């Protein structure tokens, strides 16, 4: 059948519609990227640096310069650490500066997720995927933290998208693209290895490019192993791999890595809630540490609504990916990392925490995006509106409510610095690194909170520390794991006038004079 030629300078109607649709989708991706930038850069430096961020600063040589030996000891995140060191060299070590690399990675994640959505769940899921990525409170939180998780997510997303492309075309350029992205993810955080089941399946699965993929997989595997080889000695030294031996029973006397709950019964539900709502969509982390049951009761209505909405979207999303014949990928992407980290936690090798399975988050977002893509217009608008309201509340809390923020070491130490007299010192208890960072130039000593489990020993060592100088500023934070009963705080309260103790959002401060300290053998006596 003869098809008449189009008039000069014109295009077929279908091509015109396709071009217009592509332009609209590009504008959507750009708009979502702009929103992501606004959310991630807004008040980037308003929270204090907390203890985990201090580990990054130490590895980056701050204050000072990066040292190769410190990089080799940093088994998680040498790439991110180098970025932090570079930004600090150029712009200083303010909070917003050292967090800026994470924010930029979080912004770049939006177009990366657009690519991943297009090659995995389909073009119709791209728009919901980019908006979910832009607004996710969980992603905003880690984009505003001086840790490597935003880098990991960006590298893992790009590597997975590149891998899915190899099923269609496995040329040298496509393989190199995967290798570079996988290398970036590996050098950002070793949690990228949790995607090994999914990536191995995708390298080996049947298809027209299987032969080329098998050859390329060997080269890529050797290249990645060579890349991480400088960090292998540190991995062997830092982690106790014997704990992962099959059939090993955890001795009763073996201390948990983080208090009694290396693997809390609610760990997986909490991870799913955090993926959906971040750490400000319900009770704050400090509320949960103080009283999990009380925190859940106080926020039950909000938790129930979030669970209902995201539970429904999750169920619809699983049906949508099943219709696309992607359930095998989904199981390997979601279940395998959770099982691996659960095994680590059960053997007291690593604590179960949402950030340790963050490589599964892109899959969660794409499952929800598939649900939105398959909904009718009215249902899509209603559910999108509910999610937008829930996330707006969570993001506002994160930005403006101190109880949902990180511990406020900056305010605590500025007050100490303003009131500290000559000859006095600071005693950092619980998490000393942030106290030392914000107390630079002051005399700061450490006291190990783990001894709080032996009250007599605690009283003796604290008394000795407090009696060493005329006055001591005791700065206590993150005591939940080592001193859940609050023995140290109670002991200090009994010896300090009310006028000389105060708190600053997760940080408690006591100004203890030598004369305030009573005999360690009389814990109930008070000088007041």
Language-model-derived ranges and their functions:
Residues 1-39, 118-119:
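Start-transfer (signal-anchor) and selected internal transmembrane alpha helices
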């Amino acid at each position: 059948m003869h098809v008449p030629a189009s008039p000069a300078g014109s295009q077929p109607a279908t091509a015109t519609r396709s071009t217009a649709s592509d332009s609209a989708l590009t504008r959507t991706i750009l708009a979502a990227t702009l929103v992501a930038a606004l959310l991630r850069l807004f008040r980037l430096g308003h929270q204090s640096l907390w203890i985990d961020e201090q580990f990054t600063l130490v590895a980056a040589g701050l204050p000072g310069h990066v040292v190769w030996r410190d990089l080799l000891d940093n088994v998680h995140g040498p790439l991110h650490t180098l970025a932090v060191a570079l930004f600090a060299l150029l712009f200083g070590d303010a909070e917003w500066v050292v967090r800026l690399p994470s924010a930029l990675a979080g912004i770049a994640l939006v177009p990366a997720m657009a690519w991943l959505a297009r090659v995995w769940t389909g073009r119709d899921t791209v728009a919901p995927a980019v908006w979910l990525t832009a607004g996710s409170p969980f992603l905003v939180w880690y984009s505003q933290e001086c840790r490597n998780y935003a880098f990991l997510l960006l590298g893992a997303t790009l590597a997975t998208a590149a891998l899915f492309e190899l099923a269609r075309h496995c040329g040298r350029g496509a393989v190199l693209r995967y290798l570079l992205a996988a290398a970036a993810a590996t050098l950002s955080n070793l949690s990228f290895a949790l995607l090994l089941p999914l990536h191995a399946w995708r390298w080996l699965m049947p298809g027209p490019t299987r032969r080329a993929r098998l050859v390329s997989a060997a080269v890529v595997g050797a290249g990645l192993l060579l890349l991480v080889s400088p960090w292998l000695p540190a991995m062997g030294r830092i982690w106790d791999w014997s704990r992962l031996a099959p059939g090993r029973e955890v001795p009763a006397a073996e201390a948990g890595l983080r208090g009694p709950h290396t693997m809390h019964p609610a760990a997986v539900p909490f991870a799913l809630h955090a993926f959906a709502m971040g750490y400000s969509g319900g009770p704050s982390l400090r509320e949960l540490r103080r009283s999990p049951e009380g925190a859940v009761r106080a926020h039950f209505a909000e938790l129930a609504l979030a669970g209902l909405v995201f539970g429904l979207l999750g169920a619809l999303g699983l049906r949508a990916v099943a219709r696309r014949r992607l359930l095998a990928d989904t199981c390997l992407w979601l279940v395998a990392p959770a099982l691996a980290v659960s095994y680590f936690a059960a053997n007291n090798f690593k604590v179960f925490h949402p950030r340790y399975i963050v490589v599964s988050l892109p899959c969660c977002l794409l499952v929800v995006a598939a649900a939105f893509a398959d909904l009718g217009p009215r249902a899509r608008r209603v559910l999108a509106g509910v999610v937008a309201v829930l996330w707006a509340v969570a993001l506002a809390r994160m930005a403006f409510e101190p109880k949902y923020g990180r511990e406020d070491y900056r305010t605590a130490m500025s007050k100490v610095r303003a009131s500290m007299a000559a000859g006095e010192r600071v005693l950092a208890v619980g998490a000393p690194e942030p106290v030392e960072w914000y107390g630079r130039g002051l005399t700061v000593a450490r006291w190990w909170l783990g001894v709080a489990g032996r009250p007599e020993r605690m009283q003796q060592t604290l008394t000795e520390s407090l009696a060493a100088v005329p006055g001591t500023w005791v700065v206590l934070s993150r005591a939940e794991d080592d001193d859940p009963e609050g023995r140290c705080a109670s002991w200090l309260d009994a010896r300090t006038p009310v006028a000389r103790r105060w708190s600053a959002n997760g940080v408690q401060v006591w100004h203890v004079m030598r004369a305030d300290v009573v005999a360690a053998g009389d814990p109930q006596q008070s000088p007041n």
